Amino acid sequence: PLAELLDEMAIARRVAAEPVAPPEPVAITSITLASTADPTGLAAVQRHFADRVLANALPPEIPEDLITGRLPIYHHAYRARLAEVLADTYGKTCLYMGSDTFDAHARAYAVDQPPHTRSLNRYGEGLVDALRQQYPDNPELHELAQLDWDLRTRFDGADVPVLDLDSAQASGDWTTRTDMLHPSALLRTVTTNVVSLWNAIHTDDEVPEAVLLPAPAALLVWRKGFQPHFRTLDATEAALVRHLHIGLSVHDACTALLEQGLWAGDAAALSQWLAQLLGEGLVRAKHPPAATA
């Protein structure tokens, strides 16, 4: 936000304006290297600095102390930058909660859950559970956050060639292949009208009231090329996709559905499901033969 940026710039200007006495020249006649270095020295300094940055209250400022004199910059920037990362990952959730409310939760999360890797690619996974604990009576909120997270992380799935409808019709064995579902495919169970909420926020329409569904529904999330997608499935199609998701072939999945009494053998319905999976880029092409020495 502009106000925070102006505050941060003001702190930086104040620090830059502080007079710094030039160092007195020192004549170096010899250097003696210690035989052993303190292995905990750097780690202790880093831990001490991190504790101050993560503390809710800043320590008293000592003008001649270079660390405490500049600590407000890091104390503010740490929370602000990670809150921006979370607001980007959970874009629809941020808009649903309101930017100020979300920012407060994001800053608290940044203190409770500091990053442990150099990349922030998957930072914030635990925010879904944090919102679930803080808002137990708002299941649509955590389901919306979960959908935001799932859509963003579909890009972590491997890039594999996909089978289109024309190629499938020319192939005689694709329905008997195992592990044929695209690796980015993910199935979730939702209990609210989270799909309507997400779509309304995305198109900037009036957001409907959050309601519970008559029965839990299956939500399929995947990536087609460079675009993440999601859609709900009816009960039978969801059962089919679950079998495919664990590695069964289409043939074996259909056999399992028949044995479980979940499908009556309707060929027209099966053809429609498979055509949709092919059209949505959810069927991976045949694995290339392994290279031989």
Model feature map: region roles:
Residues 1-171, 226, 231-293:
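Long, charge-rich, low-complexity alpha-helical segments
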Residues 171-175, 206-209:
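Short secondary-structure capping micro-motifs at structural edges
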Residues 175-181:
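Acyltransferase donor/substrate-recognition loop-hinge adjacent to the catalytic core
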Residues 183-246:
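Low-complexity, glycine/alanine/valine/leucine- and proline-rich hydrophobic stretches
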